[in-house]
Amino acid sequence: MRQYLRYLLTLLLALLLCQPGVLCAQGTWTVSELDGVEYVKLSDVWRFYRFTPKKGRPGCVSYGSGKHVVSLKANQQDFYVNNYRYVLSHPVREEGGELMISSVDMRKLVDPVLRPRFSVQNRLRTVVIDPGHGGHDAGAVSAYAKEKDLNLAVARKLRTMLENQGYRVVMTRDGDYFLTLQQRVAIANSVPDSVFVSIHHNSGRRAASGIETFTLAPQGTTSPFARSRRFDDLAGNNQDSENIALATAVHSRAIRSSGAIDRGIQRARFSVLCTINRPAILFEGGFVSNPEECRKMATRAYQNLLAHSICQGIVAYNNTVCKPARKVAAATSGSGRVRTSMSGSRVSSYSREK
């Protein structure tokens, strides 16, 4: 009787996933639970995307197609797509000779990056630019610059470039004054058909350098920057797929244009990302604490370069996902589900989870 009920449940889920507007993949995915986290076999992933072995990053397992090459290692959270670094929510695991990736990373990172075919309802018309810090809050400080000034300089240059492309721009601040994080989010949430880009510059060890871009950590996951493991819904998680698509478009262009060290697209629960109801990223343009990098960041030429990269990324994002879908064969829906038929004892929780 139990087997029959499981069969009916699997059949019902398959029918739901194969309704019009949903892409059903050939084959099945087996979901396994490892230390409380659901994983899928990477061999199933490669087969689903029709990936074959490729020459990729040294020391990594690399698979791909003509368009993408993916590289990763067992027991690490680094995940590379076309040599751009992402940080997974859970490490790649090796069990019984099989490499495995968490199902939440498949839904919330890998699939939206490899197949950004989802489409938002309206085209992007407005960009909310948030120059971090301001007023008495200087952010990171060195002998060469204050972070609040660098943030505002890049933001103003970005505004000009976006306006030249026909976008409306809203600045959370356009001078040296302080805003609370809640005020910044309130401004962004009041602007329809927009994205939110918070501009910052980093601080750390003297030798630390490079660019990193943050999006909100998926529900129920943690990260070095997530502060806590959260299972409740946050408003920002309603745009998980759009967040990672926007981060990919901006970050890849910034790394390519600047030649900076790629510190990756990472997950966090920064306050400005948690309660925002628009696609949102937090961009870190380099390290104020690194004297050589800070001197470079203080120049107009480098500020223009960063602003131009962010502008290009926003335009590319708009052209890719902010248009009516020709076919609803989306890699992800609003809930971020992987569109494939799956079997195994954990199929129901996998297919329903947001």
Task: Please report, for each region that a protein language model flagged, where it lies by residue.
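Primary recognition of N-terminal secretory signal peptides and signal-anchoring hydrophobic helices
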Residues: L23-A143, A153, M161, Q165, ...
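Sterically constrained small-residue positions within well-ordered secondary structures
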Residues: L16, F118-V120, G204, L273-C274
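Bacterial N-terminal signal peptides that target proteins for export
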Residues: M1-L9
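Active-site-proximal helix/loop segments of hydrolytic enzymes
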Residues: A145-K354
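Bacterial N-terminal signal peptides
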Residues: L8-P20
